[in-house]
């Protein structure tokens, strides 16, 4: 009688970076994903590194997440965003016009440093639970993503499932770009709405 040994699963190492203007909720997004917590007070981020073991697409990942310090003007690219970064979340807040306007400059800086316009990037409109304070419309975010040939999402860092979906979307784009997954993924828009503009259901992933 013969037996077949089960092949051990190995983890894929991937490094991603979260970038954006100050006070847009980058750290809240990272902490929600890596620690399943939402910070109850704001603390200025110098720069943090987080690690999470995550399973998606029948694969195990050791995901290193760099929470970069927000810059008023992205004249200096963060040193932590070395060439081994596989993908980016580019975050703005829907209640902060300046944070949205600077996204184009950050995107151009990323492409300039990496020299690869196809590097996976997700445009993330955060704080979609603050609907009554919105100054950046969803269509503007979608148009920016179209110009950058990137995916677009609106989320609130208060909702674990939404944040997890964003990181899985980025991982999927990374694996497709490396030929490890068939792509593109099925194009769809997940959108839920309610009559309350501050309801976190008023968010979109497309």
Swiss-Prot record:
It comes from the Eukaryota. GTP binds at residues 25-28, 42, 45, 126, 129, 157. GO terms for cellular component: plasma membrane. It is a lipid-anchor. Binds GTP and exhibits intrinsic GTPase activity. Belongs to the small GTPase superfamily. Rheb family. This is GTP-binding protein Rheb homolog 1.
């Amino acid at each position: 009688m013969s037996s077949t040994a089960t092949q051990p699963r190995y983890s894929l190492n991937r490094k991603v970076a979260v970038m954006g203007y100050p006070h847009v909720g980058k750290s809240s997004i990272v902490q929600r994903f890596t620690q399943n917590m939402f910070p109850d007070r704001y603390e200025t981020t110098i720069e943090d590194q987080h690690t999470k073991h995550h399973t998606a697409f029948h694969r195990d990942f050791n995901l290193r997440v760099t929470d970069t310090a927000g810059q008023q003007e992205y004249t200096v690219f963060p040193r932590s965003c070395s060439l081994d970064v596989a993908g980016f979340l580019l975050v703005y807040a829907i209640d902060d016009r300046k944070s949205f306007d600077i996204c184009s400059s950050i995107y151009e800086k990323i492409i300039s440093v990496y020299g690869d316009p196809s590097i996976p990037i997700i445009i993330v409109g955060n704080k979609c639970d603050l609907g009554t304070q919105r100054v950046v419309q969803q269509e503007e975010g979608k148009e920016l993503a179209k110009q950058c040939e990137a995916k677009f999402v609106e989320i609130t860092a208060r909702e674990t499932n939404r944040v997890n979906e964003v990181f899985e979307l980025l991982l999927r784009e990374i694996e497709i770009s490396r030929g490890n997954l068939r792509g593109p993924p099925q194009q769809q828009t997940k959108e839920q709405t309610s009559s309350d503009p501050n309801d976190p259901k008023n968010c979109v992933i497309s």
